[in-house]
Curated annotation (Swiss-Prot):
GO annotation, cellular component aspect: cytosol
Active site: E49 (proton acceptor), D60 (proton acceptor)
Function (record text): The alpha subunit is responsible for the aldol cleavage of indoleglycerol phosphate to indole and glyceraldehyde 3-phosphate.
Keyword field contains Amino-acid biosynthesis: yes
Top enzyme category: lyase
Family named by the database record: Belongs to the TrpA family.
Gene: trpA
Gene Ontology terms for molecular function: tryptophan synthase activity
The name this protein goes by in its record: Tryptophan synthase alpha chain
PROSITE patterns: TRP_SYNTHASE_ALPHA
Classification lineage: Bacteria, Pseudomonadati, Pseudomonadota, Gammaproteobacteria, Pasteurellales
Reaction(s) catalysed (UniProt annotation): (1S,2R)-1-C-(indol-3-yl)glycerol 3-phosphate + L-serine = D-glyceraldehyde 3-phosphate + L-tryptophan + H2O
PANTHER family listed in its UniProt record: TRYPTOPHAN SYNTHASE ALPHA CHAIN, CHLOROPLASTIC, TRYPTOPHAN SYNTHASE, ALPHA CHAIN
Record's keyword terms, sorted: Amino-acid biosynthesis, Aromatic amino acid biosynthesis, Lyase, Tryptophan biosynthesis
Length: 269
């Protein structure tokens, strides 16, 4: 069983949902970023969703765009990110690690080289934000060759054929987008048809469903679980904590610890 499969089986046995934080690697710098990861895991993160700094992130709102810029301004590249992942994997052999990134970062070294590197450093799953499920075959084949699970986004406007294709191809987890638009902790609305989407995904035997976009409060985690999701992903709210505490790492890690423990507590019934 993959790490994600094992995680969801264990959580189901405990009647818990998953809380998965997202951060951009090497923001604000390599050492602080690793301490951020340690803090997330120590305070209850069930898995990690990690971004690589990129100059033109498509789905990211201003908060995560700023995180990308901080890491890029510090001179951190894909090489540094893979070095960080290897360090995380060495310290935490069981934690599931997913990447959320843009296709350019996969294409530039070639898909084969990228997914080989993912496998060598301990990545479990990759979600390429700007590759729709209809155009995904070559990516899924390249990922599968190296034992990497391919994750796909289910948008709020997905029709039945798209839902069935997502359910067939996605592995590890399904990323259910709360609403159209870009990531933001401020915009906490979600589409009115999420319950129907979740039902359709489950009927199609989809991988476990994690709801993301705008998840910033424990009540939203509980709501996602009530709707039938298997957990929730929070990114902008976490990156915002980093952004407002750049002058005090102690305060940054303390606030992060509190936030993650409260969000994780909301996954327990």
């Amino acid at each position: 069983m993959s790490r994600f499969d094992t995680l969801f089986a264990n959580l189901k046995a405990k009647n818990e949902g998953a809380f998965v934080p997202f951060v951009t690697l090497c923001d604000p710098d390599f050492d602080c970023s690793f301490e951020i990861i340690e803090t997330l895991i120590a305070n209850g993160a069930d898995a990690l969703e990690l971004g690589f700094p990129f100059s033109d992130p498509l789905l990211d709102g201003p908060v995560i765009q700023a995180a990308n810029k901080r890491a890029l301004d510090g001179g951190y590249s894909t090489d540094a990110c893979f070095e960080m992942i290897a360090k995380i994997r060495s310290k935490y052999p069981e934690i599931p690690i997913g990447l959320l990134l843009c296709a350019n970062l996969v294409f530039v070294p070639t898909q084969d080289v990228f997914f080989k590197r993912c496998a060598e450093t301990g990545v479990d799953a990759v979600l390429i934000a700007d590759v729709p499920v209809l155009a995904a075959e070559e990516f899924t084949q390249a990922a599968k060759k190296h034992g990497i699970q391919s994750v796909f986004i289910c948008p709020p406007n997905a029709d039945q054929a798209t839902i069935e294709r997502i359910a067939r191809l996605t592995e590890g987890y399904t990323y259910l987008v709360s609403r159209a638009g870009v990531t933001s902790a401020e915009n906490q609305a979600h589409a009115k048809n999420l319950d129907n989407l979740i039902e359709s995904l489950k009927r199609s035997n989809s991988a476990p469903i994690l709801q993301g976009f705008g998840i910033a409060k424990p009540e939203q985690v509980k709501e996602a679980l009530v709707l039938g999701c298997d957990g929730a992903i929070s990114g902008s709210a976490i990156v915002k904590i980093i952004e407002r505490n750049l002058d005090s790492q102690t305060q940054l890690l303390s606030e992060l610890a509190k936030f993650v423990s409260v969000m994780k507590a909301a996954t327990k019934s």
